A protein has these predicted regions:
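Glycine/Thr-rich phosphate-binding loops that ligate phosphate moieties of nucleotide
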Residues: 1-51, 57, 61-62, 69-76, ...
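Conserved phosphate-binding catalytic cores of ATP/NTP-utilizing and phosphoryl-transfer enzymes
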Residues: 2-7, 260-271, 281-298
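Conserved beta-strand and immediately adjacent loop positions that scaffold enzyme active sites
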Residues: 11, 23, 103, 221, ...
């Protein structure tokens, strides 16, 4: 294993530039965390007057942006914090990072000269104040581009055709529709822009003192890249804006080297001049690295404000639901992502109505009810749902004659369940939906393993339900900040690939010592009884039938 070892006494620095904060994580050569810091935008940079890191435009429904310079100043502040922690920057062999997906930055004509001649005696903020043609960056929360989405889909032959090429149908938050909106409505700004970066490639650009390429994984979140060819799609570019490819620059693999660290950081913070900057990527791809998802059959379920399912596959089949990105840690693999808007807030709503606003009572009710919930199926949409595309509403059904087989199953709609059934209904309903949609994307049944993360992954009752429904072991991780941890891991991986002169599987770095690293995870729930798993499969099929009917009757585009 020596040939895959990292240099002793070296560090690897990972960042996560997210919606609400900038995080930094430092790993040593054994992949153990030695330092971490956090800048919270609202509280640490209050003069920007953001709320949750963003501006919501009251005059333009759905327009949500963040001040670009806030991200720059956050980096200045982060380095002040890291310096005070006595981190020896000269030991850092590589830097990489994570950026909130889909967000975009617009560099004004002439800004490349500013980037390449940064004065180490001045903070970045002071030097980049006039570098951007748009001061406020559109971000993933923005939903003001519905017209642009439909126009792009129509131009390429429909939503399914766009999904087959780019990995996703057009979504309002994706970068392509956001660029089209600027091109159509603010042509003078578009024409005064020499480079369009994602948040990830924008931050990487600061570190190399030049425009960094967009990586394949994050580039797939734009509705602009051909995911099979890993190149810009001509038809998608033409459907979006004129002269777009020249403004986007090149694409690069996530494990590639963006460049050596800029002299600014060498002179100001005493980085080694040979420190590598590995391509930055999106937050979700970095989480895949931080959760050690790297082989087909691996699945992660993130249970947070929104719920997300990640899976690894070699043979993706993009459709009208979900997203497909090239894997950031596997040269031939892909990651599939399924997003649910109704996550912890919807579970909390059921808790508040049925469990005395107490998670202890909620868990007690969940444990008191039998698996399969006596054939009761619930659909809980406190918010407009993405997957499936359904409006706000709760729908409840009781399956009659349920014996564990699909034959003879008939459902009856009811107005309400008793509190214990409602509690189990909201948990099982979401997990059955996840299993059904993941299997459509080619997830093996059962998966090899599931890694659960997010706030609700601390709930053992929910973990047991995951194991029972999916039929595999469920693991949990030491730390919840998987994006910044994943970025530091990717920094080490990129350094190793560069040393070897080409791609190496990321697992080579930790396969014999994973349990001794900050990446280790623990078994939290064992695979469910296979007879029960089969019964869940049957009721899942019935649930899918009902879901399809609801979409036909109530579904949104």
């Amino acid at each position: 294993m020596a040939e895959f070892s990292l240099p002793n006494d070296s560090y690897f620095l990972g960042f996560d530039s997210s919606t609400q904060s900038l995080k930094a994580t430092v790993l040593d050569s054994n992949l153990n965390i030695i330092a971490s810091e956090l800048i919270h935008f609202d509280s640490d940079l209050p003069h920007y007057k953001t709320q949750d890191g963003v501006y919501r435009d009251p005059s333009n429904n759905g327009r949500i942006v963040s001040p670009t310079l806030m991200w720059v100043e956050a980096l200045d502040l982060m380095f002040q914090k890291l310096s005070k922690s006595n981190l020896d920057f000269s030991k850092i062999s590589a830097v990489s990072g994570s950026g909130q997906q889909h967000g975009s930055v617009y560099w004004k004509i002439g800004s490349s000269k500013i980037l390449s001649s940064l004065d180490h005696k001045k903070p970045l903020l002071e030097q980049l104040e006039n570098a951007f043609s748009i001061k406020e960056s559109p971000i993933w929360m923005d939903c003001s581009t519905t017209a642009e989405c439909r126009a792009i889909e129509n131009a390429v032959g429909g939503a399914l055709e766009l999904a087959k090429v780019t990995g996703s149908r057009a979504y309002e938050r994706f970068t392509g529709p956001q660029i089209k909106k600027i091109f159509d409505h603010q042509p003078e700004i578009y024409n005064n822009t020499e480079r369009i970066s994602l948040v990830s490639s924008f931050m990487a650009s600061l570190f190399i003192g030049a425009y960094a390429a967009i990586d394949h994984s994050d580039g797939a979140g734009m509705n602009l890249m051909d995911i099979k060819e890993k190149a810009w799609s001509k038809v998608a570019l033409e459907a979006t804006a004129n002269d777009l490819e020249s403004k986007l620059g090149n694409l690069a693999p996530a494990y590639g080297v963006a460049g050596k660290i800029a002299s600014y950081f060498v002179e100001r913070y005493h980085f080694n001049k040979d420190c590598l900057v590995i391509q930055w990527s999106g937050d979700n791809p970095n989480s895949v690295a931080g959760l050690t998802l790297n082989i087909p059959g691996d699945l992660a379920i993130s249970l947070g404000t929104s719920d997300t399912v990640f899976m690894i596959t070699k043979d993706p089949n993009p459709g009208l639901e979900g997203h497909v990105f090239p894997s950031p840690v596997d040269a031939e693999g892909y990651m599939v992502m399924l997003c649910y808007k109704n996550g912890s807030l919807t579970r909390e709503d059921v808790r508040n109505r049925c469990a005395e606003k107490s998670w202890d009572v909620f868990n007690k009710l969940l444990q008191e009810t039998q698996p399969l919930n006596g054939g009761k199926l619930g659909f809980y949409y406190k918010e407009h749902e993405i997957l499936p595309p359904l409006p706000v509403g709760y729908h409840r059904y009781i399956i009659e004659n349920f014996s564990g087989a699909l034959d003879g199953m008939k459902e009856q709609e009811v107005k309400e369940f008793d509190p214990p059934s409602e509690v189990r209904g909201v948990i099982e309903g979401q997990l059955l939906s996840m299993r059904a949609h993941a299997e459509r994307f080619g997830m093996p049944s059962p998966p090899k393993r599931i890694i659960a993360t997010g706030g609700a992954s601390a709930n053992n009752s929910i973990l047991s339900s995951i194991a029972s429904i999916f039929g595999c072991d469920v693991y949990t991780v030491q730390r919840q900040d998987s994006a910044s941890l994943g970025a530091a891991v990717r920094a080490a991986h990129g350094w190793l690939c560069n040393k070897k002169g080409g791609y190496l599987p990321i697992s080579n770095m930790y396969m014999d010592k994973l349990e001794k690293t900050s990446l280790s995870c623990k078994l939290s729930a064992s695979a469910g009884d296979q007879e029960l798993v089969s019964k869940y499969a049957a009721i899942m099929k019935k649930r899918t039938e009902i879901e399809n009917r609801l979409v036909q009757k109530l579904g949104r585009c």
